């Protein structure tokens, strides 16, 4: 079953990039910008992560935390964060539990080869833990700016 707008976000336990156990409910009282990306250190994923990094303060001013999610290991996340000075949490979803709950673990095709992987997507979760906005099949260019503007518009209401 896939989460839909207005529903509570799944509260699964995952490992953070420092080995800590993390649940989305740990951030109740804040907006969560939850973004799923395919793989650390790849061009599109690096661009997206750096765009979120560069807008991190603007999101924080709106009482939002940014959380990235991929199947990569804690060690790979650590190297990725260090190399690109990422100031936000990266979650290890090596069993694809959170990706499946948000329906972003998909059959993909590249150069004629089929495989399972993350469909780049972002979800905005409100301060009570409910999904309020989703962006699926994200194109990296201008995505972070759009997500930030959406949050600004919502917080002005």
UniProtKB/Swiss-Prot annotation:
Domain (Thioredoxin) ranges: 3-156
UniProt KW keywords: Antioxidant, Disulfide bond, Oxidoreductase, Peroxidase, Redox-active center
GO cellular component: cytoplasm
Highest taxon in the source lineage: Bacteria
Protein's gene: ygaF
Record-linked InterPro entries: AhpC/TSA, Peroxiredoxin_AhpC-typ, Peroxiredoxin_BCP/PrxQ, Thioredoxin-like_sf, Thioredoxin_domain
Disulphides: 45-50
Family the UniProt entry places it in: Belongs to the peroxiredoxin family. BCP/PrxQ subfamily.
Subunit description: Monomer.
Organism for this UniProt entry: Bacillus subtilis (strain 168)
Remarks, miscellaneous: The active site is a conserved redox-active cysteine residue, the peroxidatic cysteine (C(P)), which makes the nucleophilic attack on the peroxide substrate. The peroxide oxidizes the C(P)-SH to cysteine sulfenic acid (C(P)-SOH), which then reacts with another cysteine residue, the resolving cysteine (C(R)), to form a disulfide bridge. The disulfide is subsequently reduced by an appropriate electron donor to complete the catalytic cycle. In this atypical 2-Cys peroxiredoxin, C(R) is present in the same subunit to form an intramolecular disulfide.
Coiled-coil residue spans: none
Job of this protein: Thiol-specific peroxidase that catalyzes the reduction of hydrogen peroxide and organic hydroperoxides to water and alcohols, respectively. Plays a role in cell protection against oxidative stress by detoxifying peroxides and as sensor of hydrogen peroxide-mediated signaling events.
Entry protein name: Peroxiredoxin Bcp
Biological processes per GO annotation: cell redox homeostasis; cellular response to oxidative stress
Database matches in Gene3D superfamilies: Glutaredoxin
Substrates-to-products reaction catalysed: a hydroperoxide + [thioredoxin]-dithiol = an alcohol + [thioredoxin]-disulfide + H2O
Xref: PROSITE patterns: THIOREDOXIN_2 (PS51352)
PANTHER family registered for this protein in UniProt: AHPC_TSA FAMILY PROTEIN, THIOREDOXIN-DEPENDENT PEROXIDE REDUCTASE
